[in-house]
A protein has these predicted regions:
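Gly/Gly-Pro-rich "capping" loops immediately C-terminal to redox-active cysteine motifs
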Residues: 49, 66-102, 126
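N-terminal secretory signal peptides that target proteins for export/translocation
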Residues: 1-14
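C-terminal motif of bacterial Sec signal peptides marking the signal peptidase cleavage site
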Residues: 26-29
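The canonical Cys-X-X-Cys-His
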Residues: 56-66, 138-142
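C-terminal capping alpha-helices of c-type cytochrome domains
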Residues: 104-156
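Sec-dependent signal peptide recognition
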Residues: 15-21
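Electrostatic cytochrome c docking/interface patches
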Residues: 31-55, 152-156
Length: 156
């Protein structure tokens, strides 16, 4: 019977380093899906975009941008110009269908500030984005990443 390795022994340290390198290599290979978008932005726009990206992190719990992942909320791909409750492959709530809102900068801002107040009875559980600068950044980010193919385009 072999003795259990002690934390810090040379074998475990080598394996640990290899694991970290493997994870880092994988991350580098995948790249940043927003790189093509960022390349087209000015420096000040990039700052707003990155802030919006941070604000959007909780959104990805229920939503996606590809429309291929089965999530609780609708895909946000192509959300601008779409009517509420009509996302492809998603059964919209009765409240969203009845509201029949066309999503644009103004309607998304009002909804994201107070989801249950703007569309009573909808299923979104977010309390809303109360900070105007955070909301502005989130909308800027969504405007850019939700366009079909936006993340696929190569920078000029």
């Amino acid at each position: 019977m072999r003795p259990r390795p002690v934390i810090g022994d040379p074998v475990r340290r080598r394996c640990g380093r290899a694991w970290v390198l493997l994870v880092l290599a994988g991350m580098l290979a995948c790249g940043d899906p927003d790189r093509a978008i960022e390349a087209r932005l000015t420096e000040s726009e990039r700052a707003i975009f990155m802030r919006g990206r941070s604000v959007a992190v909780p959104c990805w719990t229920c939503h996606d941008l590809a429309g291929t992942v089965d999530k609780v909320g609708p895909s946000l791909a192509g959300v601008f110009g779409r009517r509420s409750g009509t996302a492809p492959d998603q059964q919209g709530s009765e409240a969203m269908l009845a509201a029949s809102i066309v999503w644009d900068e103004r309607t998304l801002a009002a909804f994201l500030m107070d989801p249950s107040g703007f569309v009573p009875g909808n299923r979104m559980v977010s309390p809303g984005v109360g900070d105007p600068e955070m909301l502005r950044a989130l909308l800027f980010y969504l405007r850019h990443v939700s366009q079909p193919g936006a993340r696929d385009a190569e920078p000029d």
